[in-house]
Regions:
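His/Glu-rich zincin catalytic helix
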Residues: 1-88, 122
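Acidic/histidine-enriched segments that form metal/cofactor-coordinating
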Residues: 2-7, 87-145
Length: 148
Protein backbone atom coordinates (compact mmCIF):
# COMPACT_ATOMS: atom_id res chain seq x y z
CA UNK A 1 0.00 0.00 0.00
CA UNK A 2 1.51 3.25 -1.14
CA UNK A 3 0.72 6.65 0.36
CA UNK A 4 0.84 9.35 -2.25
CA UNK A 5 0.66 13.00 -1.34
CA UNK A 6 -1.20 15.05 -3.89
CA UNK A 7 -0.38 18.71 -4.36
CA UNK A 8 -2.81 20.95 -6.17
CA UNK A 9 -0.35 22.83 -8.35
CA UNK A 10 -3.08 25.05 -9.77
CA UNK A 11 -3.33 26.93 -6.44
CA UNK A 12 -0.56 28.86 -4.76
CA UNK A 13 0.10 27.68 -1.20
CA UNK A 14 -1.05 29.96 1.59
CA UNK A 15 1.58 32.44 2.73
CA UNK A 16 2.41 32.05 6.40
CA UNK A 17 4.27 34.83 8.17
CA UNK A 18 5.95 33.65 11.35
CA UNK A 19 5.03 35.47 14.54
CA UNK A 20 8.64 35.47 15.72
CA UNK A 21 11.94 35.01 14.02
CA UNK A 22 14.88 34.21 16.23
CA UNK A 23 18.29 35.01 14.83
CA UNK A 24 21.15 34.27 17.20
CA UNK A 25 23.58 37.10 17.74
CA UNK A 26 27.09 36.55 16.43
CA UNK A 27 29.97 36.89 18.88
CA UNK A 28 33.01 38.83 17.70
CA UNK A 29 36.54 37.96 18.75
CA UNK A 30 39.89 39.40 17.71
CA UNK A 31 43.15 37.55 17.41
CA UNK A 32 46.39 39.04 18.72
CA UNK A 33 47.15 40.22 15.18
CA UNK A 34 43.79 41.99 14.89
CA UNK A 35 41.94 39.50 12.70
CA UNK A 36 38.21 39.55 13.41
CA UNK A 37 36.48 36.24 14.02
CA UNK A 38 32.70 35.99 14.11
CA UNK A 39 31.05 32.99 15.73
CA UNK A 40 27.40 32.15 15.29
CA UNK A 41 26.85 29.20 17.62
CA UNK A 42 24.27 26.57 16.64
CA UNK A 43 25.46 23.37 18.35
CA UNK A 44 22.14 21.63 17.75
CA UNK A 45 23.09 21.15 14.09
CA UNK A 46 26.37 19.30 14.66
CA UNK A 47 27.95 21.08 11.69
CA UNK A 48 30.66 23.73 11.49
CA UNK A 49 31.03 26.21 8.66
CA UNK A 50 34.32 28.08 8.59
CA UNK A 51 34.70 30.90 6.06
CA UNK A 52 37.78 32.98 5.43
CA UNK A 53 36.82 36.30 3.85
CA UNK A 54 39.51 38.38 2.17
CA UNK A 55 39.31 41.83 0.62
CA UNK A 56 40.81 40.35 -2.52
CA UNK A 57 38.24 40.41 -5.29
CA UNK A 58 38.80 41.28 -8.92
CA UNK A 59 38.74 45.04 -8.21
CA UNK A 60 41.89 44.66 -6.08
CA UNK A 61 44.03 42.76 -8.57
CA UNK A 62 46.83 44.42 -10.48
CA UNK A 63 47.12 41.59 -13.05
CA UNK A 64 43.99 40.34 -14.88
CA UNK A 65 42.61 37.05 -13.51
CA UNK A 66 45.18 36.98 -10.68
CA UNK A 67 42.57 36.93 -7.89
CA UNK A 68 40.47 34.29 -9.63
CA UNK A 69 43.45 32.07 -10.44
CA UNK A 70 44.76 32.29 -6.89
CA UNK A 71 41.51 31.48 -5.09
CA UNK A 72 40.57 28.74 -7.57
CA UNK A 73 43.94 27.02 -7.21
CA UNK A 74 44.07 26.97 -3.41
CA UNK A 75 43.29 23.25 -3.18
CA UNK A 76 45.88 22.33 -5.80
CA UNK A 77 48.53 21.50 -3.28
CA UNK A 78 50.34 22.50 -0.14
CA UNK A 79 53.88 22.05 1.07
CA UNK A 80 53.24 18.39 1.91
CA UNK A 81 49.91 17.47 0.26
CA UNK A 82 48.94 17.08 -3.40
CA UNK A 83 45.55 18.16 -4.73
CA UNK A 84 44.45 14.53 -4.68
CA UNK A 85 45.52 14.06 -1.05
CA UNK A 86 43.67 17.21 -0.03
CA UNK A 87 40.51 16.03 -1.81
CA UNK A 88 40.76 12.53 -0.34
CA UNK A 89 41.34 13.82 3.19
CA UNK A 90 38.38 16.19 3.05
CA UNK A 91 36.22 13.48 1.49
CA UNK A 92 37.24 10.96 4.16
CA UNK A 93 35.87 13.24 6.88
CA UNK A 94 32.80 14.20 4.87
CA UNK A 95 34.06 17.76 4.71
CA UNK A 96 33.27 20.22 1.97
CA UNK A 97 35.48 22.96 0.51
CA UNK A 98 34.42 25.82 -1.74
CA UNK A 99 35.77 29.12 -2.99
CA UNK A 100 34.02 32.13 -4.44
CA UNK A 101 35.05 35.54 -5.60
CA UNK A 102 33.39 38.75 -6.69
CA UNK A 103 34.61 42.28 -7.34
CA UNK A 104 35.42 42.98 -3.69
CA UNK A 105 35.89 39.72 -1.82
CA UNK A 106 37.38 36.25 -2.06
CA UNK A 107 35.80 33.66 0.22
CA UNK A 108 37.20 30.25 1.15
CA UNK A 109 34.71 28.03 2.99
CA UNK A 110 35.02 24.69 4.75
CA UNK A 111 32.00 22.77 6.06
CA UNK A 112 32.30 19.67 8.23
CA UNK A 113 30.67 17.69 10.98
CA UNK A 114 31.53 19.15 14.39
CA UNK A 115 33.23 15.93 15.44
CA UNK A 116 35.71 16.26 12.53
CA UNK A 117 36.37 19.98 12.93
CA UNK A 118 39.94 19.53 14.22
CA UNK A 119 40.84 17.23 11.30
CA UNK A 120 39.25 19.56 8.76
CA UNK A 121 40.89 22.60 10.35
CA UNK A 122 44.29 20.94 9.90
CA UNK A 123 43.64 20.57 6.15
CA UNK A 124 42.37 24.16 6.03
CA UNK A 125 45.55 25.33 7.76
CA UNK A 126 47.67 23.57 5.14
CA UNK A 127 45.64 25.01 2.27
CA UNK A 128 45.61 28.53 3.66
CA UNK A 129 49.09 28.82 5.21
CA UNK A 130 51.30 26.30 3.40
CA UNK A 131 50.01 26.92 -0.09
CA UNK A 132 52.02 25.93 -3.10
CA UNK A 133 50.93 25.78 -6.68
CA UNK A 134 52.94 22.72 -7.79
CA UNK A 135 53.85 22.87 -11.46
CA UNK A 136 53.04 19.16 -11.90
CA UNK A 137 49.48 19.79 -10.73
CA UNK A 138 49.06 22.73 -13.13
CA UNK A 139 50.52 20.75 -16.05
CA UNK A 140 48.18 17.85 -15.23
CA UNK A 141 45.15 20.12 -15.27
CA UNK A 142 46.23 21.75 -18.53
CA UNK A 143 46.71 18.38 -20.26
CA UNK A 144 43.26 17.25 -19.08
CA UNK A 145 41.73 20.38 -20.62
CA UNK A 146 43.60 19.76 -23.88
CA UNK A 147 42.15 16.24 -24.12
CA UNK A 148 38.59 17.53 -23.81
Amino acid sequence: MENKIHFDRSRQPETVIPERLEVPEACEYRTASGVRIYVLPAPEYGVVRLSFVFRAGSSWQKVPFCASATVNNLAEGSRDMTARQIAERLDYYGSWFDVSMDRDWSVVTFVCLSKFFDKTLEVARRIMLEQEFPQEEQIGRASCRERV
